[in-house]
């Protein structure tokens, strides 16, 4: 008998078909998962000529309302081996009930729910495709072992660590720790066939748009063993212009940056205590610090007493100036984007909405072609579909709840019309176009045959 490392739990090899009226699980087998036809409710924008008998073969973007397990089973027949990028954001199983999802499933039921879906998702991936699973710390450990089993541990790529909120934003004071990190597990369908897309320097060039103009000689002091020129607020000007390689990036000195690099530590140790002496909005030109080859770095004290943090300005690091491509970092700070996420798409999805910035990063890790398919079977408010559409990719989104109609449908209509200028729209120059089909899963073909007398019980 072959031995292997695996998770074991009750009903592992069964399929959770749903919950009864008392909230107890209804278990079945894979054979109980019957493929369904799609029934179109609405065609939005530009779609291919109608062939309503088989919407799976149309090649149009699909927004599907219905149980995602049944929908995935239906897609498997037509899309096996065709999906380039799959992103899912399943319920985190935190026990925190919120409006749009049952986020408190019993632990083993949650694992069974995930296993059945992961097995089909694996079959849908193209040989060079990637699966991305968004999760927090509650189920991360168990999920990692489960996905290793389903996808193959050798196909694990990395875990993308997301900073989703600032550590100084305390949500609940009675917790042992303040959670600011979430995770995205990344798996290839076949690791040897997978090519991750590296980033070019131009990706971050938009941040380098600041220029510091000095109007006087300032005064020179020795601060912390470094030569520092100090300027009053009326002796300098910060100009924001078009991004270029000779401009500077402004960095807010907050959170981990305070202790995470030499600039943050210097500011906290030597410049913060000088605010009372030098005054607010003082500019410091500190010599011999930074890795951008300039030989100095500008620091600014907080503007006034209403502000807690200062800033520093840096150029493009030397090691990146000559590099045409750089590997993706497995850490992404999306705190600023999360602060604006409720504005995105014109729909509200509190506590569960994901930012378009994140989905753009994930899709572009693996997808480069307009022929690539992107799938999200826990579509939520429609972010994955919206981003895939704006990036010119083909997409399929599945959502069970009523918000398929109240959130996803109106959001994606605004994307098609070009009305949606939130999220990544301005970054990618989105003006509208394309289209999709809004569908529901049809009735059980087996049940219909029984009712029509085509199948009879003896």
Predicted regions and their residues:
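Glycine-rich adenosyl-nucleotide cofactor-binding module
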Residues: 52-74, 336-375
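Conserved S-adenosyl-L-methionine
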Residues: 7-9, 107-111, 140, 355-427
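DnaQ-like (DEDDh/DEDDy) 3′-5′ exonuclease domain used for proofreading
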Residues: 1-85, 94-108, 113-116, 292-297
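Conserved Class I SAM-dependent methyltransferase catalytic core
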Residues: 107-161
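Conserved proline-anchored active-site loop of SAM-dependent methyltransferases
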Residues: 81-96, 147, 374-388
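Conserved phosphoryl-transfer catalytic core
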Residues: 403-449, 454-457
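Active-site-adjacent helix-turn-beta-strand microarchitecture at beta-sheet edges
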Residues: 2, 177, 190-345, 356
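Class I S-adenosyl-L-methionine
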Residues: 157-190, 441
């Amino acid at each position: 008998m072959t031995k292997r490392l695996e998770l074991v739990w009750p009903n592992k090899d069964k399929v959770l078909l749903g919950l009864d009226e008392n909230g107890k699980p209804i278990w079945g087998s894979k054979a109980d998962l019957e493929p369904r036809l799609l029934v179109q409710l609405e065609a939005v924008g530009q779609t291919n000529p109608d062939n309503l008998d088989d919407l799976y073969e149309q090649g149009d973007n699909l927004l599907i309302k219905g149980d995602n397990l049944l929908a995935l089973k239906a897609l498997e027949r037509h899309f096996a081996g065709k999906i380039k990028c799959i992103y899912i954001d399943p319920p985190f199983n935190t026990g925190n009930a919120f409006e749009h999802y049952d986020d408190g499933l019993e632990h083993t039921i949650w694992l069974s729910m995930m296993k059945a879906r992961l097995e089909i998702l694996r079959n849908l991936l193209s040989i060079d495709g990637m699966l991305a699973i968004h999760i927090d710390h509650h189920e991360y450990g168990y999920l990692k072992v489960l996905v290793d089993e389903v996808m193959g541990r050798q196909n694990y790529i990395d875990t993308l660590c997301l900073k989703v909120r600032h550590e100084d934003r305390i949500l609940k004071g009675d917790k042992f720790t303040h959670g600011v990190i979430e995770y995205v597990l990344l798996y290839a369908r076949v690791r040897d066939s997978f090519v991750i897309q590296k980033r070019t320097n131009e990706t971050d060039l938009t941040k380098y748009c600041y220029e510091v103009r000095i109007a006087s000689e300032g005064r020179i002091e020795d601060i912390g063993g470094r030569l520092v020129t100090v300027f009053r607020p009326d002796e300098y000007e910060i100009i924001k212009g078009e991004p270029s390689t000779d401009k500077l990036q402004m960095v807010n000195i907050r959170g981990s940056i305070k202790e995470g690099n030499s600039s943050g530590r210097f500011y906290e140790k030597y410049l913060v205590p000088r605010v009372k002496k030098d005054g607010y909005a003082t500019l410091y030109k500190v010599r011999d610090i930074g890795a951008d080859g300039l030989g100095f770095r500008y620091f600014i004290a907080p503007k006034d007493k209403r502000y807690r943090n200062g800033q520093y300005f840096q150029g493009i690091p030397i090691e990146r100036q000559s590099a045409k491509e750089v590997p993706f970092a497995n850490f992404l700070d999306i705190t600023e984007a999360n602060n604006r996420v409720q504005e995105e798409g014109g729909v509200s999805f509190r506590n569960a909405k994901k930012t378009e910035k994140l989905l753009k990063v994930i899709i572009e890790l693996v997808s480069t072609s307009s022929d690539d398919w992107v799938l999200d079977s826990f579509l939520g408010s429609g972010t994955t579909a919206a981003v895939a559409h704006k990036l010119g990719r083909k997409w399929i989104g599945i959502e069970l709840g009523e918000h398929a109609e109240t959130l996803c449908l109106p959001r994606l209509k605004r994307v098609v019309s070009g009305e949606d200028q939130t999220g990544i729209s301005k970054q990618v120059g989105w003006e509208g176009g394309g289209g999709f089909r809004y569908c529901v899963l049809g009735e059980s073909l087996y049940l219909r045959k029984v009712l029509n007398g085509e199948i009879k019980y003896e």
